[in-house]
Amino acid sequence: MGLITTEPRSSPHPLSPRLVHELGDPHSTLRATTDGSGAALLIHAGGEIDGRNEHLWRQLVTEAAAGVTAPGPLIVDVTGLDFMGCCAFAALADEAQRCRCRGIDLRLVSHQPIVARIAEAGGLSRVLPIYPTVDTALGKGTAGPARC
């Protein structure tokens, strides 16, 4: 896969230099950018997420979530992915729970029906709400109070 571009958002919690370096490895199959929009933080992912780069995906999602303050949300746009293994869904579900405890929604963006089918089959559709576009995910209001 091609070179990864990671743009840390200008916030008190940018992505770590180590993560930016690892994502920038020319042999990495994961591409990602982060961007802020008001209180929201967006991750735009491309390439592939599988067992070989699950650790990078988890670190990216965790570090990005740490930079979001309530009410957020954290929006993860996976429309640029060619492959999204089950490990990617598990990482998102784990982080969604941590975000909910902080009063932040994690919202997944995909227009691919298979993403919704996998989330539904894995029992994750309530944990990972899926929106067809970033704009619709941004327009859904706030998470409200923390709920663990």
UniProtKB/Swiss-Prot annotation:
Matching PROSITE patterns: STAS
Pfam families per record: STAS
Keywords associated with the record: Stress response
Cross-referenced CDD domains: STAS_anti-anti-sigma_factors
Sample GO molecular function, one term: anti-sigma factor antagonist activity
Stored SUPFAM superfamilies: SpoIIaa-like
Family: Belongs to the anti-sigma-factor antagonist family.
Protein name, as recorded: Putative anti-anti-sigma factor Rv2638
Lineage: Bacteria, Bacillati, Actinomycetota, Actinomycetes, Mycobacteriales
